[in-house]
Amino acid sequence: MAAEWRINMQSLIDELKDEYGYSSYDIAMVKYVLTSIFYEFSKLIIFGIFFGFLGYFKSFLVSLILLLFLRINIGGIHCKHYITCFLLTFVVLFSSIILLPKLLFVAPILIIFICTICMIINYKIGPIASPFRPSPDSILIKKCRNTGFVIIFIFIIFVSFFHKFSLFDTYFQVGFWTIVLHTAQLFIAKISKKEECANA
């Protein structure tokens, strides 16, 4: 399936380049987007089946939605290979959905406080784009930062208004740990990027 996907994608790229005059930048963007969609879609199916089987499908959706929007706009650690990307995503999802909420219940006031710090960190050091993706311009960087800021801010608002309803406790814990782990990997990615630039 993967081999057939690559062949079809290469045919599409050749057609865009030869018949429609797409630039190298445009081709790089198309290739990155199509590859990302294929890889992400395959991971989502596997993760959905796994967490659904364990009875955590709703929590999975909460974590997934937050993680997808934050990763798309703010970025973070980008793995070179599918398997390492798969494993990293699994660790983040498993930790935020099952492991950490069972180990520690975080009070709503702490969720709001820590998420506010995470919101500022994401805005200040993001976005960190994949090296396989064309570098974003200043307008796109600002847009991504603002979007990431708004996503976490909306989560904070939800916690502020609905924390008294126990129905949402599980999802607030999952969302909180998802934001914290995303921010942690973003911070690690920033440090790694600085070290790469220093050694270049």
Task: Name these PLM-found stretches.
Residues 50-63, 109-116:
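Structural signature of hydrophobic alpha-helical transmembrane segments
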Residues 67-78, 125-134, 187-190:
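C-terminal ends of transmembrane helices
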Residues 72-88, 94-99:
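Interfacial aromatic-anchored transmembrane helix boundaries in multi-pass membrane proteins
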Residues 80-91, 109-115, 137-143:
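Cytoplasmic-side transmembrane-helix entry/capping segments in multi-pass membrane proteins
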Residues 96-109, 150-167:
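Hydrophobic alpha-helical transmembrane segments in multi-pass integral membrane proteins
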Residues 128-152:
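Membrane-helix boundary/juxtamembrane motif in polytopic membrane proteins
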